[in-house]
Amino acid sequence: MSHAVLKSALAVFAIDPAAIGGLWLRARASPQRQAFLDCLAACSPPLPITRLAPNISDDALFGGLDAAATLSIERPVFRSGLLDRDAILVLPMAERCDPGLAARLAQILDNKRHSIIALDEAAEEGEGVPPALIDRLGLFVNLDGLRFKSILEPIEINAIVAARALLPKVRVPHMLVTEVVRA
């Protein structure tokens, strides 16, 4: 993957991560992957970045009844979940994501309020991010084989801010959308 393609992927994601759905990042834990993620964070995405545990519970995601607090004060107490606020969700070890969690995360992406960075550390060809998530992630970046010196510098933040401001004015002809989808 070339430097220009990496920079373009970062820019597209940083401009409107919720609209793009997310980013499938194939790379083992490495200085290259961390440099890419640091560069993404430096682009000041419009949503906060939250790291998920690979085995996160539904209560932690969606919130729910806090049993201990409810028993303590003898009336229902609800606690919020991570999904109560819009965010970019970083999913480590996405290749090991449980199908049920993948389905719930896919459903979340359909609301266009969240985005996911799926960190795919798959070592073998048969492993990978669950298809339910892949279908909703608009970008794929493969850092395998890149040397550390080829990782890019942060994108000019003023360009990202300007692109965000122009985004509502962009109109794409239906025929162009059809052609891109067919390609």
Regions inferred by a protein language model and the residue ranges of each:
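Basic, amphipathic alpha-helical bundle interface domains used for macromolecular binding and assembly
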Residues: 102, 147-183
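Conserved ASCE/P-loop NTPase catalytic core
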Residues: 1-137, 141-144
